[in-house]
Amino acid sequence: MSFSPLIRQLIDALRTLPGVGQKTAQRMALQLLERDRSGGLRLAQALSQAMEGVGHCRQCRTLTEDELCPQCADPRRDDTLLCVVEGPMDVYAVEQTGYRGRYFVLKGHLSPLDGLGPEAIGIPQLLARIEEQGSFSEVILATNPTVEGEATAHYIAQLLTNKGLITSRIAHGVPLGGELELVDGGTLAHSFAGRKPIAL
């Protein structure tokens, strides 16, 4: 089926979203145009406002509408802990754990094949933040448990050696409520390697 230029433009724009392929983009576009024009206009307005008004926190680099995000602006947070994550969504995930320290958001992970080296993801800015803040006693590396995430954590840990900081890595393993037979071998290996004695 051949679409008009404006419909084609809408479909192509929707395909830029993660996980949205050609067919899904077509369904979304036609749904908005045929059945939910007011929803489409709200979406366009919200998207336009977000693109104009949302930037990056000057301290941790997460997404925010203000100069400082709510976490960096909160004076009650623990200034001795710094959690390093790969992206803004990770901040929201870590917040759900009750973590009350500070954050630094990388722009992804090291991936030489994709041209993402230390500068591209913000490692020099991370080191500068640690140096300037001066109050951190522990840096928690909460990068994803992928090959690239592990490499990124290892690289940062090496850079922080001899800086007088505790450098820790979040644990990876069997999810709470998970069944061992359903857990992949790599995750199970991490669980065994990170096992701890039971305190009675």
UniProtKB/Swiss-Prot annotation:
Gene3D superfamilies assigned: 3.40.1360.10, 6.10.250.240, RecR Domain 1
UniProt-recorded Gene Ontology molecular function terms: DNA binding; zinc ion binding
Pfam family, one: RecR_ZnF
Keywords recorded for this protein, A-Z: DNA damage, DNA recombination, DNA repair, Metal-binding, Zinc, Zinc-finger
Zinc finger (C4-type): 57-72
One of the protein's GO biological processes: DNA recombination
Protein name (record): Recombination protein RecR
Organism: Pseudomonas fluorescens (strain ATCC BAA-477 / NRRL B-23932 / Pf-5)
Gene it is expressed from: recR
